[in-house]
Amino acid sequence: MQNIRNFSIIAHIDHGKSTLSDRLIQTCGGLSDREMEAQVLDSMDLERERGITIKAQSVTLHYKAKDGETYQLNFIDTPGHVDFSYEVSRSLAACEGALLVVDAGQGVEAQTLANCYTAIEMDLEVVPVLNKIDLPAAEPERVAEEIEDIVGIDAIDAVHCSAKTGFGIENVLEDIVKKIPAPEGDPEAPLQALIIDSWFDNYLGVVSLVRVKNGSIKKGDKIKVMTTGQSYNVDRLGIFTPKQVDTTELKTGEVGWVVCAIKDILGAPVGDTLTHQHHSATEVLPGFKKVKPQVYAGLFPISSDDYEAFRDALGKLSLNDASLFYEPENSTALGFGFRCGFLGLLHMEIIQERLEREYDLDLITTAPTVVYEVLQTNGETIYVDSPSKLPPISNIDEIREPIAECNMLVPQEYLGNIITLCVEKRGIQTNMVYHGNQIALTYEIPMGEVVLDFFDRLKSTSRGYASLDYSFKRFQTADMVRVDIMINSERVDALALIVHKDNAAYRGRELVEKMKELIPRQQFDIAIQAAIGNHIIARSTVKQLRKNVLAKCYGGDVSRKKKLLQKQKEGKKRMKSLGNVEVPQEAFLAILHVGKD
């Protein structure tokens, strides 16, 4: 056990943690050169295409150190994107240390900071590594100072390495062995194993990734999931080298996978504790905090026959992604579907793409909203995650919107633009600290503004140099209203949105104009209106297509023409009372892009 080291790799997006993991695997001979490929741990096609890590992956390697001992290194590669910070906190719960990878050209960024503080809160040993040292723009000395200034950990002896060329990788491994403590735990105690992650395999059922804290787990053991109290037989267990390799036992301090023929998706929840059925532990291991979704959106299958398949797909996906929340919902415009909760917009996009790719579904998404706290006139407080659930105006005493605390790290030259952007998003500055050329800004910005397009706008105003980390702070009273879109005086529930009163007229007008472009012309006029309650704030009309009924009248009497026009008018009137308007799929997506251009 003294020779085991468990650690995670944490870093900002694109600072090279997946490439560093590749080098560690190669150096320790986890895979032969033939099997080696770039970003070997990003196993999902989506991860490779976008060049980001979405799921944390674990690997067990054996490293013969300079002191002659062979060490077992269990490491977990984590995502760097702010939407997947939950994956990071899960991975850190299973480790004793973390490698903080910082790009020697870019320096410290907001996500580096956020993940690093999470690690320090969990009492992990943080080992700084300066990566991309081979770049002409690399300034390791400046970045080392920055790490000390901003993060507050000693970085003078930080290893300089280049994951791409393989320079300095040996030193990184030596640092891991020397600086990260060995796991603590009692091999004789009853088994306690923390479930870090689970996923569904069509042949094996539920596969769980576990970290053994106390005791050991062998093939054929009878184990029990502590919160549900259900017992299972251990069929297979093993480690990842990144390939799945079977072993007969996982000892104290090790990280590996376990298959117990669990068919029920909820059988082994992430963050739960496994123990032996007969010789069981008395208390559950401290898991990790359950995250609350920040963004909600309705997902509906385009054809209603796919509803069952969609439900099963969500179940399997939520096993693999514990931060996904879903509940059934039905809409008059779109039929049956699910209301899903996500951690952010990137998370929402990724989930939608995974459902469409891995489970072959066609889905429509409604506009994302955040959760509002509504105080009703009868004194009751309710939480609203969808505009259609908002009670009538007469029953509402006040609406409170969620406020996010945004920490940004910004280069000096872009400060002006970013302050303008934050003010436009109704932000209030709470702090500003200069660290050399970087400025740490703290703003309180309504969550609804942050999740929509704040991140994209922040990146474009700062040419990609500013970085952001946000977290929910509190609910605060605000003047929010619900804008309904009416087509031929019928409300379309899927197009409603909750906005601040000051922006309502502008957002309503913009949406109405957008809908006008997207709804095809019919044989009669279509009125598109935006309304707050019964008060219309914007209107636009899609003009009718009409046949020229006078084409065959040459000269002749005017009363003949009047008769034909009158007849056409009556026909149109009858049509309008009977006709209904098909709203195309693009129109629902238009909401997502209102205010972006």
Swiss-Prot record:
Protein's membrane topology: Peripheral membrane protein
InterPro entries, A to Z: EF-4, EFG_III/V, EFG_V-like, EFTu-like_2, G_TR_CS, LepA_C_sf, LepA_CTD, LepA_IV
EC number: 3.6.5.n1
Superkingdom of origin: Bacteria
Domain tr-type G: 2-184
Gene Ontology biological-process entries: positive regulation of translation
Principal subcellular localization: membrane
EC category name: hydrolase
Residues reported in the UniProt entry to bind GTP: D14, H15, G16, K17, S18, T19, N131, K132, I133, D134
An example Gene Ontology CC term for this record: plasma membrane
UniProt-annotated location(s): Cell inner membrane
Record GO terms (molecular function): GTP binding; GTPase activity; guanosine tetraphosphate binding; ribosome binding; translation elongation factor activity
PROSITE patterns: G_TR_1, G_TR_2
Reactions mediated catalytically: GTP + H2O = GDP + phosphate + H(+)
Cleaved signal peptide residues: none
Keywords, comma-separated and alphabetical: Cell inner membrane, Cell membrane, GTP-binding, Hydrolase, Membrane, Nucleotide-binding, Protein biosynthesis
Pfam families on file: EFG_C, GTP_EFTU, GTP_EFTU_D2, LepA_C
Heme found in the keyword field: no
Family annotation (NCBIfam families): lepA, small_GTP
Protein family per UniProt: Belongs to the TRAFAC class translation factor GTPase superfamily. Classic translation factor GTPase family. LepA subfamily.
HAMAP family xref list: LepA
Protein's job: Required for accurate and efficient protein synthesis under certain stress conditions. May act as a fidelity factor of the translation reaction, by catalyzing a one-codon backward translocation of tRNAs on improperly translocated ribosomes. Back-translocation proceeds from a post-translocation (POST) complex to a pre-translocation (PRE) complex, thus giving elongation factor G a second chance to translocate the tRNAs correctly. Binds to ribosomes in a GTP-dependent manner.
Full protein name: Elongation factor 4
Native organism: Haemophilus ducreyi (strain 35000HP / ATCC 700724)
Source species taxonomy: Bacteria, Pseudomonadati, Pseudomonadota, Gammaproteobacteria, Pasteurellales
